[in-house]
Amino acid sequence: MAPRSLLLLLSGALALTDTWAGSHSLRYFSTAVSRPGRGEPRYIAVEYVDDTQFLRFDSDAAIPRMEPREPWVEQEGPQYWEWTTGYAKANAQTDRVALRNLLRRYNQSEAGSHTLQGMNGCDMGPDGRLLRGYHQHAYDGKDYISLNEDLRSWTAADTVAQITQRFYEAEEYAEEFRTYLEGECLELLRRYLENGKETLQRADPPKAHVAHHPISDHEATLRCWALGFYPAEITLTWQRDGEEQTQDTELVETRPAGDGTFQKWAAVVVPPGEEQRYTCHVQHEGLPQPLILRWEQSPQPTIPIVGIVAGLVVLGAVVTGAVVAAVMWRKKSSDRNRGSYSQAAV
């Protein structure tokens, strides 16, 4: 999430459409990790539009600064990078102080490593309006404090987090942040969507297929794969005779493929011989209509068994003859050139 005053630098270039295909999001993720005896905590921040990372900051870099991760953001001018880098450095210092305070409030030893994570951002609907805003923190992998959906109140996870909650309430931080979410966060998101529209507003349809994996004589797994799709939002379901098999479906989380697209699978265990009663249904915004797939059994070989056996006999004879010939040639060659035999050996 960019600093509030950054929008003033960018406002002259905001000539954007009023409607969008689907909803979109802008997210700023941060992680501060203490490392006793090895200097200040390390701070890493990444920023995403939808499922695409486009900015990254690492305090351990040779020159700590906000770095572009997508070509479309490289067009921004020097002031943009100055502001985003300054914002990340300020957050890094704030989180380092917060880590020390939390260590003291939880009465923890300074010998151990601790982690403070944050996530801020906004979701925008197709009409360009705010769907939901976020501001939350976790300490050592557990919820600490978060802004509620009403954007007016906070949820504190424990008595220590309530100290932070009282501070936020005294400073009227929820109101300040709500103003940002409803205004500048959405404006920045619209700008990024426009500048990176060839990447961010694309819809790559999934390539889907069903794989068959026998488990035993009594069971087999049908796994429905969806590969190479963007954005990450997708729905995979299995049906048996038209009835959805929600309870019996194993579904993995959508995961990045490493090339800017995503992959996912859903599996069901079925009795042998009943595979054709099951259909996989794939829904994605890149598809003109949902895909419906069944397992396609590979055709059985049509070569007669007798022909196969005869062929193997002939092949065996050929191989045997070749081996005998090679040995005889090798022996003759050895008799003629004993001095060079070792160099010729494989």
UniProtKB/Swiss-Prot annotation:
Residues 330-346 are cytoplasmic. Belongs to the MHC class I family. It is a single-pass type I membrane protein. This is HLA class I histocompatibility antigen, alpha chain F. The gene is HLA-F. A motif (Sorting signal sequence) lies at residues 336-338. InterPro entries: Ig-like_dom, Ig-like_dom_sf, Ig-like_fold, Ig/MHC_CS, Ig_C1-set, MHC_class-I_related, MHC_I-like_Ag-recog, MHC_I-like_Ag-recog_sf. It comes from Homo sapiens (Human). Induction: Up-regulated in CD4+ T cells upon stimulation via TCR and upon HIV-1 infection. It is found in: Cell membrane; Early endosome membrane; Lysosome membrane. The chain crosses the membrane at residues 306-329. One of its GO terms (molecular function) is TAP2 binding.
